Curated annotation (Swiss-Prot):
The keyword Membrane applies. Residues 89-143, 307-384, 416-469, 512-532 are annotated as: Disordered. Keywords: Membrane, Signal, Transmembrane, Transmembrane helix. This is Formin-like protein 11. Residues 461-884 form the FH2 domain. It comes from Arabidopsis thaliana (Mouse-ear cress). The lineage of its organism: Eukaryota, Viridiplantae, Streptophyta, Embryophyta, Tracheophyta. Residues 346-358 have a biased composition (Basic and acidic residues). It is found in: Membrane.
Length: 884
């Protein structure tokens, strides 16, 4: 603020100085103007003098006013534009009157004209102000110079404040920059002092921040600490004492805080790099504010274990009353720590544990066993820095440490463990000793297993406290509860229904015994050492072998006899046929059979049977032959019945007649008119021709006409007459017409039942039937070749040949009958095609297409009949009135 005030005062002084110079210039110009007026006017001396005084006084006031306005404009109190307008108005109001013309008598003349004094000027309001009268005579040279001088002065009036303001702003900016530079320089000096102090402290403590790490330690037990301390060689008593002197020599709370901050910073950087070792030893050397002596050195050693077992415990070992300010390490919340202190000298190589601490914690320590012989030397590990991981901010840890210290100090008897000071030369670490037996009251001897993150093992407990067995899961989607609305699940009560645990476990529990048996069986069977087949093919053979569910000896015996295998087993055997290369590998294998897998053993046994897979195919053919023959015979008989139904159906022929007459009537005058026959494909197009109302089709009209004609025919028959006599004789013609229509619709709709075999035949594939007959013929020929040629003359194959010979005779007879049926049916189908379509030898690719067309037409006819039953005919002479 002081610099800012000085800068502001400097700006004001510079501005006032500029305005003062300008004021003196304006006063000089005003005096010259008065002198000129006195010299130029000879007559009217008093008038001129009076005007000059008036102008001088008014000019002085105007100059003062202008200076004041400029100063206000500089301070941003008023705008320059407003002052400019005000100056113009005042100059107009105080402008002098024009000078009178000179006298006509230059020498004075006889009569001297009196000079009248001018009237005092009155101020004119701005809104009534008139423009000045124009001069009739040219301006004189002094007036022109005066105006030029005024113009130059106006420019100077504008330039001077601008330059002054700019200079003041630049000066202010320069001052501010200088202040910031001074502050930054001072701060840099302070940081340099702090860094130099930290360097000195780092050099003094570098001797105590090196310690060797033994990765083979087991820090869960106290004996391992002693063994490890015997191998430590990086810390010396002299270095620790020198470090304590340096630490005690520091005075001031600020320096102590900086030291702690620097150490904690090094801890945070080194902690991440120290995770590669399984064990870490942390030594922290801190000073005591109360005692400034060398003997007050405190060296707590914090042992950190990376594992997070539940059996880890906190052990505190103290050795005297100087541990008045203990610190605990918070490196890991689940790791144990051991604090080892030396009271006055490091020559006492013992760790003392008070009896009070043992009694409080219930720990009994047994003597460690003798150390084993040292192993061969191991490569040396790099030393790690000492990490001070004390967190005094934690109130709970401080309270716990103070309590432990009091118990340790109050103890009288102690149990000591020998600890040797590490030598200057590093020695290879021995293998870890066996763990000490720690017996804690209320805790088992063996440590509990580590916590597992597998939530599937954490099963809920039942009423008796035992874990509930795992059942088969029911997959569903949970519904989240909504507090703002009521749901049906809120009304359920948990106590209203209880499960029968025994029943649900017996029904939906996992069969653990079977799985264990399977595992035992798998473990007993040794894994094969050799594989003759490819893994993928071997996997397929293994799956098919499970489907057989029989041994190799049973299969080979059944193949030799030609009987004894079911259809499923024969199908699996046929699928297991190996290739020629695989069969050659199996035959040429001379090694131990036990080394092969189960599938390879089975295949090798089958390969030893002559024509084993051909026998299986022959037996499968015999098993399926009868079913194939029955299916073909049923299909042929169905085709024959369908052909008979189409030829003998009187109603179908009547329907074709109605369609032919209707089509010829509609095609009158066209090339399609006058037809005597049409292909049955036209039946499917009747529903595409719609009437004028957009609903009635040509099929509706045909069905209506046939129903009416068939109804009249039925009523004229003997049965119709009997029914008419029983009914009322006084029926109206409309009622009779309705009866005719109803009886005719019943007859037309019965056409679906009459042509039922035609509808079934439409689903038959005639080419498939012909192919099936051909396959049966080929299979029977292969079976005959196998039995009569390949296996003939061998005594071992006599049973198979005899069983197949009887089947060959039956098969040949059945196939001969099938050939005759096939020939007859194909002739009937050809006759039906010619019966309806004429000569279609080269046009019809599918001989059964006629049956497909009739099936589709019967479906359309049944739909139209259902529609006509739902519509009642009104009192109208036209039968198609309901469709208009």
């Amino acid at each position: 603020m002081v610099y800012f005030r000085q800068i502001f005062l400097m700006i004001i002084v510079v501005s006032l100085h500029c305005c003062k110079v300008r004021f003196f210039c304006i006063v000089a110009n005003a005096k010259e103007l008065d002198d000129w007026k006195v010299l130029t006017v000879e007559n009217g001396e008093r008038y001129r003098t009076h005007v000059g005084r008036y102008a001088g006084e008014e000019g002085g006031e105007k100059i003062k006013l202008r200076v004041l306005e400029k100063f206000r404009a500089l301070l941003d109190l008023i705008k320059p534009s407003t002052s400019r307008r005000r100056n113009l108005a005042e100059s107009a109001s105080f402008s002098p009157w024009p000078a009178p013309s000179p006298s006509p008598f230059p020498n004075g003349g006889p009569i001297e004209s009196p000079a009248y004094p001018p009237a005092p000027p009155r101020p004119i309001p701005p809104h009534l102000r008139r423009p000045l009268p124009q001069r009739t005579h040219p301006l004189e040279q002094p007036e022109i110079q005066r105006r030029k001088h005024e113009k130059g002065g106006t420019f100077k009036k504008i330039l001077v404040p601008v330059v002054a303001s700019t200079a003041s702003a630049i000066g202010f900016v320069v001052c501010v920059v200088g202040v910031f530079c001074l502050c930054a320089r001072r701060k840099r000096k302070m940081n340099g002092k702090t860094l130099s102090f930290k360097r000195k402290k780092g050099k003094s403590q570098s001797s105590t921040r090196k310690v060797s790490v033994n990765p083979t330690l087991d820090f869960l037990y106290l004996n391992s600490l002693g063994v490890d301390l015997e191998r430590q060689n990086s810390v010396s008593v002299k270095e620790i004492r020198e470090t304590e002197k340096d630490l005690n020599g520091i005075n001031g709370g600020l320096l102590e805080e900086e030291v702690k901050r620097s150490i904690e910073t090094e801890i945070s950087h080194d902690w991440d790099n120290a995770s590669s070792y399984s064990t870490k030893e942390i030594v922290s050397v801190h000073e005591n504010d109360e005692e400034q002596t060398v003997n007050s050195v405190s060296v707590p050693v914090v042992v950190i274990n990376d594992s997070s077992d539940d059996d880890e415990s906190f052990h505190s070992v103290g050795g005297g009353s100087q541990y008045s300010n203990p610190r605990l390490s918070n490196a890991s919340s689940a790791s144990g720590s051991v604090n080892v202190g030396s009271s006055q000298r490091f020559s006492e190589h013992k760790l003392d544990i008070p009896e009070c601490s043992r009694s409080d914690f219930g720990i009994s320590v047994s003597a460690p066993p003798p150390p084993p012989p040292p192993p061969p030397p191991l490569p040396q590990f790099s030393n790690k820095r000492i990490h001070t991981l004390s967190s005094p901010e934690t109130a709970n840890l401080q309270t716990l440490s103070s309590q432990l210290c009091e118990k340790l100090c109050a103890s009288s008897s102690k149990t000591s463990f020998p600890i040797n000071v590490p030598n200057s030369q590093p020695r290879p670490p021995p293998p870890p000793p066996p763990p000490q037996q720690l017996q804690v009251a209320g805790i088992n001897k063996t440590p509990p297993p580590p916590l597992s993150l597998d939530f599937s093992e954490r099963r809920p407990l039942g009423k008796d406290g035992a874990p509930l067995p795992k059942l088969k899961p029911l997959h569903w989607d949970k519904v989240r509860a909504t507090p703002d609305r009521t749901m049906v699940w809120d009304k359920l009560r948990t106590s209203s229904f209880e499960l029968d645990e025994e029943m649900i476990e017996s029904l939906f529990g996992y069969t653990m015994q079977s799985s264990t048996k399977n595992e035992e069986g798998k473990s007993k069977t040794p894994s094969p050492g050799k594989h003759l087949l490819e893994p993928k093919r071997l996997q397929n053979f293994t799956i098919l072998l499970k489907a057989l569910n029989a041994t190799a000896d049973q299969i080979c015996s059944a193949l030799g006899k030609g009987e004894g295998l079911c259809l499923q087993q024969l199908e699996a055997l046929v699928k297991m046929v190996p290739t020629k290369e695989e069969e050659l590998k199996l035959r040429s294998y001379k090694g131990a059979v036990d080394e092969l897998g189960s599938a390879e053993k089975f295949l090798r046994a089958l390969v030893g049977v002559p024509f084993a897979f051909q026998r299986a195919e022959a037996m499968l053919y015999r098993e399926t032959f009868e079913d194939e023959v029955v299916h073909l015979r049923n299909s042929f008989s169905m085709l024959e019945e369908a052909c008979k139904e189409l030829k003998s159906s009187r109603l179908f022929l009547k329907l074709l007649e109605a369609v032919l007459k209707t089509g010829n009537r509609m095609n009158v005058g066209t090339i399609r008119g006058g037809a005597k026959a049409f292909k049955l494909d036209a039946l499917l197009k009747l529903s595409d021709v719609k009437g004028t109302d957009g609903k009635t089709t040509l099929l509706h009209f045909v069905v209506q006409e046939i129903s009416r004609s068939e109804g009249i025919r039925v009523s004229d028959s003997i049965m119709g007459r009997i029914m008419n006599q029983r009914s009322n004789k006084n029926r109206t013609p409309e009622e009779k017409e309705e009866d005719y229509r109803r009886m005719g619709l019943d007859l037309v709709s019965g056409l679906n039942t009459e042509l039922r075999n035609v509808k079934k035949t439409a689903t038959i594939d005639l080419e498939g039937l012909v192919t099936s007959v051909s396959n049966l013929r080929d299979g029977l020929g292969q079976l005959s070749c196998l039995a009569s040629e390949k296996l003939k003359g061998d005594e071992e194959n006599r049973a198979f040949v005899s069983s197949m010979s009887s089947f060959l005779r039956y098969g040949e007879k059945s196939l001969e009958e099938l050939r005759e049926d096939e020939k007859r049916i194909m002739e009937r189908v050809g006759e039906i095609a010619e019966y309806f379509h004429g000569d279609v030898r080269g046009d019809e690719k599918n001989p059964l297409r006629i049956f497909v067309i009739v099936r589709d037409f019967l479906g359309m006819l049944d739909h139209v009949c259902r529609e006509l039953r739902c519509v009642r005919v009104p009192n109208s002479p036209s039968p198609l009135a309901p469709f208009r």
